[in-house]
Amino acid sequence: MMVIPSGPIQDACCDYKSIESIQSDVFDKIQNLVKTKFFRHYRANLWKECPFWNEDALCTNRDCSVATIDEETLPLEWRKAALSAIQLPPTKGRLLMPSQQKCTYKDQDFCLVDDKLDSDHVVYIDLTENPERFTGYAGPSSARVWKAIYEENCFDIVHRMTEGCETCNNIMNLGDSSTKHRNPFAHVPKDKAELHQFLTDLAEESDGSNEDEVCLEKRVYYRLISGLHSSISIHICDEWFDQETGIWGPNLKCFVNRIGTHPERLQNVYFAYALLLRAVNKVGPYLEHYEFRTGSLKEDEKTSYLVQDLIKSTTSCPPTFDEKSMFRGSEAHVLRQEFKEHFRNVSQIMDCVGCEKCRLWGKLQTVGLGTALKVLFSYEDNSLNPITNPDLFERNEIVALFNTFNRFTESLNAIQRFRDIYLDQTSPKKEELLAENKSQSYIQPYVTKLFNQFKSWNIPLPNYIKLLI
């Protein structure tokens, strides 16, 4: 079968099979949760200026636009007038540069959340009405965003994280442009040799990383960024718009080109899922007594039940990631600060995305991963109590965390769907099987008669006849 990784997930505490099993168990639960009133409404500023370069390549495709909702229809506690106690001076639509952002985030934060910034320009969005999918946004604008992330905010380790893998290729194709990269899977694997090489790369123990050169913290950071990028690509391929038929649906060629040509990207989706799963599990006690304040007691109770039911499923398995293994030793403090600064920059770079809907989901999932990192690395287990520490997380952070977990859950589900499509395209056609069965049923009586005749003569049956039996 295509794309079935096996063995342990590098830098995590579980294997691929366990993650797929957990994903199957929680899929329906997280799907139901993100449709609730609390989790489907997200607050964002989609019109900040890009703080790093002049970005005017806005997508004009109607699929790029985001439909907002009237905030007057939402609970009072969620509205602009009910923001947290942090009051910020007006920024006139501009995002402050890092040197000016001393008051825009806490030291525990790994990213910038719109709730704390420029409250005059934020809007509410129903995420179920604005799904993440193919919009046609691509080209120089999109490439510039990812180039800035990988080249300037990834510890300069992209090359080393893909060394030693024959079919791997770093995301930006950096390096000597005169060297032609081997890319044997620009199409669906068509024979056992290609498929074997692909699966071998998936199972490679090191997947290109050199532990002597790249420390754990930097590897984890890179895997998260790559996993996010790969997950977004999977969503685009899974909900692809066929311009000829006018139908939305999965595009196998897109998936193979974006993910199948780079086995390490698939690995990193699983890794990011393992980290998110651990964060959701760890934040469970905090949400046990959390007040969702949807404006309806019945809705609050329903939301709380769905959250606890989901978290209960995550506690049924051993921890999938060990956060205590990170940021230890003499360089721990420096590494932690660099890690945060890089990830905060990534959250700002999402304001440079030229497609409104892509920007929305890029910002949300960056906040979601940032919240997961905050849960894992900023607080001990006994600190996660909403009664004694009620203001640890903004509402937006909780919404982003679970929606990001859902997006990665859907990515793993899409991988299974693409496997099935691949098998359907490469397996013998139904008509061929029927014709073969019909042919066999026609000659079988004659073969049986011949077999009995040879047996009565004590003559060994020829091999070519044995194959027909």
Name the predicted role of every residue range.
Residues 1-469:
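Extended non-catalytic scaffold regions that mediate assembly and binding
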